[in-house]
């Protein structure tokens, strides 16, 4: 059995949210939420005393919070001037600390394949020289459905794919894929790659993660750390999360990039590290990181950002507009690529079709959320 809730809205809020359903949760803090006595259908909705609201359900065992520690919200705070690329871009009030979502709804969208694809595009756009042969070493790359598309977007890249899982069969016939190793990235293989790619421009992308426990996260972080120190890539993009095993966690210093279309309460980011020369280290604090990501996920992601680009399954939320900005940057840097020779709206449509199951899931989620807005 589920619990049913409504989030009360005013007319101005309701009007803008009709076109921006990903932004609904911005207004749905504790003081706006009421528990409903009945499930919602076409009959019970007519009996509701509220005229503007969003309804949703939660598992019966969901706990309650009595008071939010987030800043007071208002309609004028919904709109923001610029997107946030990194965690350093977020200036956080020290009074904001992480607390569980509990009865509050989530209206942002989680699409793992789209998240991974856009993070990879961002990394290659910023760190793969356009006029130089680039070798991309990629442990954790199976099944690799999106890599076929990436080889078209970045033709200067040659790919070394490593994963014990099964790879997409078409990758074996792609001339840009120079090596596929159906195995773990062992110390022996790391040394082999170091030797064969000596004096080559190298990028390391790591997407390893089997289990979400803090012990496993620490183990994966240390594996990535070892690979960077041995391979010495020009840059590495590492799957990054601070384990809660100690208050201060010593790890690489780098640029901590936010992800688009991550899980609604995710603290995972992508850490980009310069692998040549003396590698800088940093003392990370998981509590600080959790607080920043909590504020980002609850307030900044569902805020409204300016764009003139339209598509039937996206709106003005942070994830959607950050994707638009990234594609605009790609179009400017690679104007002659076939993908760039269309409007941004059509670029979005193309990539949604090329990434497995993404368009259906994105549009279904968009329309389902919109349907619950009354």
Model feature map: region roles:
Residues 161-166:
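Conserved acidic E/D residue at the C-terminus of a beta-strand in Rossmann-like folds
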Residues 133-142:
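Conserved class I S-adenosyl-L-methionine
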Residues 167-198:
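S-adenosyl-L-methionine
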